Regions:
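N-terminal juxtadomain amphipathic helix
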Residues: 1-80
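Short, glycine-/aromatic-enriched active-site segment of Class I SAM-dependent methyltransferases
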Residues: 29, 196-215
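Conserved class I S-adenosyl-L-methionine
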Residues: 100-110
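Conserved SAM-binding loop of SAM-dependent methyltransferases across substrates and taxa
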Residues: 111-122
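Conserved SAM-binding motif I beta-strand of class I
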Residues: 124-129
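Conserved SAM-binding strand-loop segment of SAM-dependent methyltransferases
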Residues: 142-155
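A conserved beta-strand element that flanks and buttresses the S-adenosyl-L-methionine
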Residues: 166-169
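A short glycine-rich, Lys/Arg-flanked "PGG" loop and its adjoining helix->strand segment in the class I
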Residues: 181-198
Length: 215
């Protein structure tokens, strides 16, 4: 568990939490026996707001290896997600000029539900998903997926092995990232290759990145 005393973004000293919910077990981990309940681990859940940049953030972070290596939620179980990503793929094809054989990279790609829509449009796809159990499902379904966390090192390896990327998706992931600077350094590993668009949620928004081209 990581105890944060500095803001993740601006590195200013964090004040005391404005909200402290005490010790909490991990979400999406229902237990089936009394013995399991007695041995269940709990972690602090407290939130501070940086007085310099205003970012609200957790003071304590459960190790990513413990949270995300074996994950429960699967994207394909949600009809709303399936409808959304189908529209998203078509929108990006039109807006960014994506076409056959372009390579689309998705960070935290889950079981490949979104990337399959790009495959249907004739594009090549690559997923980066830390949950080994879910990455295995994606690969079984024909969606090329790397079972790793996305960071500068992973991105550098992928840029060297796969070359030009035409679009990068990151949906519902940035808020889960502890080291946001390392994550963004990873995005920038592709800037010489790609038209980049970072997407967030059902309401699609774009983060402007200092890249040579942007769709």
């Amino acid at each position: 568990m990581s105890d944060h005393t500095q803001c993740r973004v601006c590195k200013h000293a964090l004040p005391k939490p404005f909200l402290d919910l005490g010790m909490m077990p991990l979400a999406n981990a229902f237990l089936s026996s009394k013995t399991e309940c007695q041995n269940e681990k709990s972690f602090p859940l407290a939130v501070s707001a940086c007085e310099s940049c205003g970012l609200a953030q957790l003071n304590y972070v459960v190790p990513a290896e413990q949270l995300y290596r074996n994950y429960i939620y699967v994207s394909s179980t949600s009809e709303a997600v399936r409808v959304h990503v189908q529209a998203l793929a078509n929108m990006l094809m039109e807006r960014c000029g994506l076409g056959a054989n372009d390579l689309v990279l998705e960070v935290a790609s889950n079981d490949g539900t979104a990337l399959r829509e790009f495959q249907k449009l004739g594009m090549r796809v690559l997923g980066v998903e830390p949950a080994r159990n879910i990455a295995a499902v994606a690969n079984e379904n024909g969606v090329n997926t790397i079972a790793e966390f996305f960071n500068a090192k992973t991105a550098q390896d992928l840029a060297e092995s796969h070359g030009r990327v035409s679009a990068i998706l990151a949906r519902h992931v940035f808020a889960h990232v502890d080291d946001v600077h390392d994550f963004l350094h990873g995005i920038h590993e592709f800037e010489e290759f790609a038209q980049l668009r970072v997407l967030n949620g059902f309401r699609t928004t774009a983060a402007q990145l200092p890249v040579k081209q942007s769709c």
